[in-house]
Amino acid sequence: MATTKHLALAILVLLSIGMTTSARTLLGYGPGGGGGGGGGGEGGGGGYGGSGYGSGSGYGEGGGSGGAAGGGYGRGGGGGGGGGEGGGSGSGYGSGQGSGYGAGVGGAGGYGSGGGGGGGQGGGAGGYGQGSGYGSGYGSGAGGAHGGGYGSGGGGGGGGGQGGGSGSGSGSGYGSGSGGGNGHH
């Protein structure tokens, strides 16, 4: 009787682990690869042209034109780093370095690089810079939610500023923004 209970318990534990891993991979947090849905490229993270999270080191690229989030090129961070995203919305956490370039037709394009934590975003919706390092972003959006301008994130633990769009900087560090205001709504 005890053996049957132990066997049933072991099966339940294995099923729980399997479902948790699948869910994490689908959400893009998992350590595995995976083309769409989860993290792109190797090692899980990867940047995307659209929105998404990248954890771990990796490389991924996504294109697309006319979307709300511009396509382009994104690269994950070094060790556990998030990485900046070119056109889309998203955030990067952890330490490492990530950079991305994206130009979206109909979306918000621009250039965003994140060092250490998140990094700034070019033309997308906001951007977080968390962790240690340096993040900067340059973006110009045609018809996007946020306009162009230049914003540089903070040093250690610093947030990030955005030139044209809406953004906030928290923690210690330095954030500055210069450039145009909001884009065309």
Curated annotation (Swiss-Prot):
GO cellular component, one term: extracellular region
Main location: secreted
Subcellular location: Secreted, Cell wall
UniProt keyword annotation of Cytoplasm present: no
InterPro entries xrefs: GRP1/2
Signal peptide: 1-27
Description of what induces expression: By infection with rice yellow stunt virus.
Superkingdom, taxonomy of origin: Eukaryota
Region Disordered, annotated ranges: 149-185
Keyword line: Cell wall, Cell wall biogenesis/degradation, Repeat, Secreted, Signal
GO biological process entries: cell wall organization
Entry keyword annotation includes Cell membrane: no
Job description of the protein: Responsible for plasticity of the cell wall.
Name of protein: Glycine-rich cell wall structural protein 2
Lineage: Eukaryota, Viridiplantae, Streptophyta, Embryophyta, Tracheophyta
Record gene name: GRP0.9
